[in-house]
């Protein structure tokens, strides 16, 4: 999202733009997402949900997102729904493939399968490589020693290229570099890409969460359950058990009832054990996007001549969770505008 939005905005402002895409297609992890671009309905709720984030950055995203979403629709991005399904948030669900195509039409065709290397002297550079969740080494360094056991719930190319380049150019790390957004997934041999959303085990608030040694998760459980999945990621094998009482099986989640989610886990081979008046499901931490990254100002600046947006930029969702697509959209546009001065 961030790179394509920056390119489209820069072209709109009359700039010549080159886009270097490491992967074999455009769209990054946006194409694998549900396509919902949202913000918290109320500013105070945003601060409650992400209390450790940079307040100035958060204010920019919160105040500019609605106009940025209108800009996307003006480019022809197809809207699927104008509701998020969450009373705490407002936003729009786009068709991810159609959104990608609209941004490409407005911007430029990326040079696929190409890594940038070193920046070009005197040419503004916007880093939008999607974070570092695809690098086992960087995840091990900053997030968890259990990096090899995590399931990558994202594209395989976002492996810290932007982070490393920005640091080498004089940038610094944001707060929250140890945090990430992800989901608990069925602990099975493989979770297919088309199961990243539908197989999510999002019912920790109805369960007792314990690791293999019987140690319980005792922390808070927010609506997105990111605190839980981060805890799971630091347990042996990045695994845990959700133990659900029978009384909670009919509870509704955003992906279906708890019983339906458990059945999906069973069907893909996860261990599901029936116990006395409860069901236990083995889950593994899936990492979608790192929360921390390069420290930026409200225009996305990292260092002289270098900007960052999306997963490469940290500081917006620190301490919780907010729409990564929203941050990428707003800050990608802002970075392009500032880079063109």
What is the meaning of each model-derived region?
Residues 1-19, 336, 340:
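N-terminal Rossmann-like FAD-binding beta1-loop-alpha1 element of flavoenzymes
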Residues 22-109, 207-222, 247:
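Conserved N-terminal/central alpha/beta ligand/cofactor-binding core
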Residues 123-185, 325, 331-334:
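Glycine-rich loop(s) and the adjacent beta-strand/alpha-helix scaffold that form part
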Residues 163-165, 169-274:
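An anion/pyrophosphate-binding glycine-rich loop and adjacent beta-alpha core
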């Amino acid at each position: 999202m961030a790179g394509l939005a920056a390119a489209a905005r820069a072209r709109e402002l009359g700039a010549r733009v080159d886009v270097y895409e490491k992967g074999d297609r455009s769209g990054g992890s946006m194409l694998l997402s549900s396509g919902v671009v949202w913000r918290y309905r109320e500013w105070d709720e945003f601060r409650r949900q992400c209390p450790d984030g940079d307040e100035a950055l958060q204010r920019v995203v919160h105040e500019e997102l609605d106009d940025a979403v209108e800009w996307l629709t003006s480019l022809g991005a197809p809207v699927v729904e104008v509701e998020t399904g969450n009373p705490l948030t407002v936003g729009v669900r786009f068709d991810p493939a159609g959104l990608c195509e609209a941004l490409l039409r407005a911007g430029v065709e990326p040079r696929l399968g190409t890594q940038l290397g070193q920046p070009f002297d005197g040419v503004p550079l916007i880093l939008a490589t999607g974070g570092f969740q695809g690098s086992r080494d960087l995840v091990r360094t900053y997030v968890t020693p259990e990096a090899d056991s995590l399931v990558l719930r994202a594209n395989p190319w976002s492996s810290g290229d932007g982070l490393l380049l920005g640091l080498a150019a004089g940038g610094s790390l944001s707060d929250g570099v140890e945090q990430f957004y992800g989901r608990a997934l069925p602990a099975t041999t493989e979770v297919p890409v088309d199961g990243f959303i539908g197989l999510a085990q999002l019912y920790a608030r109805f369960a007792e969460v314990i690791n293999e040694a019987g140690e319980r998760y005792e922390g808070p459980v927010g609506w997105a359950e990111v605190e839980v999945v981060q805890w799971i990621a630091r347990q042996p094998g990045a695994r845990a058990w959700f133990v659900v009482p029978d009384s909670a099986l009919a509870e509704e989640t955003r992906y279906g009832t708890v019983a339906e989610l458990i059945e999906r886990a069973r069907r893909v081979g996860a261990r599901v054990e029936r116990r006395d008046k409860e069901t236990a499901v083995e889950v593994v931490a899936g990492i979608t996007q790192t929360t921390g990254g390069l420290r930026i100002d409200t225009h996305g600046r990292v260092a002289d001549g270098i900007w960052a947006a999306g997963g490469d930029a940290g500081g917006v969702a620190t301490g919780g969770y907010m729409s990564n697509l929203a941050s990428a959209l707003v800050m990608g546009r802002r970075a392009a505008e500032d880079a063109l001065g």
